[in-house]
Amino acid sequence: LPPARMRAVGALPVRPWESPAAMRRRALPLLPAAWRERAERLVREYAKLPADPLGSIFGFFDGHGWNMAFDSEAGRLNGVYDFADAGIGPLHQEFIYSAFIDADLTERIVAAYERFSGRRLERRRIALLTAAHRLSELAELADEPRHLPEMLAGALDGLALAEAQGLA
């Protein structure tokens, strides 16, 4: 769906993430000491990231496993739901949420998108955005004890994924 058309009918930009300064101030101190320096390098790189070279799209921006209905016996995705986070945002950001399920799934989605669209995505950018998103969520919920264990685990998963991609 063309972003200009979607804006004309009321689509809004996706909700911004926490700033790099907020990630440093609120998320990094919560990380185990062994991860802080690597996380700081990622936040620094994220802060310098230029605008998405492929522009903005109207997208789902919430394509993780909790918003997908799978038929595990058939190995098939039957549907997606919860479009509350849909909006206009950077194209590469649309590809980070599947990493909550599995990094291999993200790679398969990216490869399929490239095949169908003829566009090349930057895997490094996707990995960096994945880690930054997890740190942003940790920063956002740092003062909510009931969410902290899950957000910390997510941030550590994102950092490990970034490291596996050669980033951290």
List the predicted regions and their residue ranges:
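An alpha-helical support segment within catalytic cores of ATP-dependent transferases
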Residues: 1-62, 72-73, 114, 155-163
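Alpha-helix boundary/interfacial micro-motifs
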Residues: 16, 79, 99-101
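Helix-rich C-terminal or lid/interface subdomains of diverse kinases
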Residues: 22, 52-55, 85-88, 96-168
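Acidic active-site catalytic centers that drive phospho-/nucleotidyl reactions
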Residues: 62, 82, 94
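Acidic donor-binding loop at a coil-to-helix junction in glycosyltransferase catalytic cores
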Residues: 91
